[in-house]
């Protein structure tokens, strides 16, 4: 499933969210996927367990994190949620803190995870100005329009 379609169909966008800790921020993204029946509630704990084991492996660029677990950790279908934070948070990453954009991903298999999920997110942020454009979005439609413009330019 495409990033844009998943966000639109699942109504899984939350802008200017408030969170006290990185764990709270991750939970916001996972809860959107739980509400859309994309993942089971246990997916949240699986992500936390992954961080405990491997560190903040999903902080992939300055200000951007892509929380995700493994397919067998509660994924029902492939989907994404997108959360922007009102106040950036520390994820304990050496290079890319603080974070204020979270794209939570659930993939049914490793191939989908790598080829579909990561590539769509890389495409969105290939234009670094899209970080600030996304931070400026205040409605779901503005986010979807930004993704549409990026896809049209690709």
UniProtKB/Swiss-Prot annotation:
Database matches in InterPro entries: Ascorbate-PTS_EIIA_comp (IPR051351), PTrfase/Anion_transptr (IPR016152), PTS_EIIA_type-2_dom (IPR002178)
Subcellular location field: Cytoplasm
GO molecular function, one term: kinase activity
Active-site residues (renumbered): 68
Transmembrane segments: none
Chief place of localization: cytoplasm
Every PTS EIIA type-2 domain range: 6-150
Description of what induces expression: Induced by L-ascorbate. Repressed by UlaR.
Sorted UniProt keywords: Cytoplasm, Kinase, Phosphoprotein, Phosphotransferase system, Transferase, Transport
A family per Pfam: PTS_EIIA_2
PANTHER family: ASCORBATE-SPECIFIC PTS SYSTEM EIIA COMPONENT (PTHR36203:SF1)
Protein name: Ascorbate-specific PTS system EIIA component
Organism field: Shigella dysenteriae serotype 1 (strain Sd197)
């Amino acid at each position: 499933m495409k990033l844009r379609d998943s966000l639109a169909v699942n109504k899984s966008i939350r802008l200017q969210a408030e969170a006290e800790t990185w764990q709270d921020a991750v939970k916001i993204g996972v809860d959107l996927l739980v509400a859309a029946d994309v993942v089971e509630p246990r997916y949240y704990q699986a992500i936390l367990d992954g961080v405990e084991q491997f560190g903040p492996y999903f902080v992939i660029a300055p200000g951007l994190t892509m929380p995700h677990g493994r397919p067998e950790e509660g994924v029902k279908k492939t989907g994404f949620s997108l959360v922007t934070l009102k106040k950036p948070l520390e994820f304990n990453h050496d290079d890319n803190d603080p974070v204020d954009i979270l794209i939570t991903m659930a993939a049914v298999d490793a191939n989908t995870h790598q080829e579909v999920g990561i590539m769509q997110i890389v495409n969105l942020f290939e234009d670094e100005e899209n970080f600030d454009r996304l931070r400026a979005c205040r409605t779901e439609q503005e986010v979807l329009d930004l993704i549409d413009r990026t896809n049209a330019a690709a």
